[in-house]
């Protein structure tokens, strides 16, 4: 299930709420309720606290309504931490991933609090594992030290049509 958490990206290069909503919608249409849940929860480590504002778009309203009815469980936390450790070029330490996301989307008011929750979740799973999460991720030292430019969508031309 966790591998499908970003299935909303199937609609293209879109912002966080759009890919969350589209993943939820697609998974629901397929009858994949557990995948739909992960599509909704993986980008919101603060869960209910994430929505201390009134959303503008219909997609954001739907996400808020879902999250407010949702009780976070360990699987939600696990997918959130896995998502926070992965880039398109491999596993990285959390700080590297946080900078990567911030460079692409900008800083949002709730990011720092979300980072704190992510570190708490990391420590929670490390307690269960009896070791650092970083100890079990292949090549994390090498990929953390890579410095690729932030990912940008390809430029459309006569040969490429999304």
Task: Label each residue range with its predicted role.
Residues 107-162:
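Charged phosphate-binding loop/patch that engages nucleotide di/tri-phosphates or the phosphate backbone
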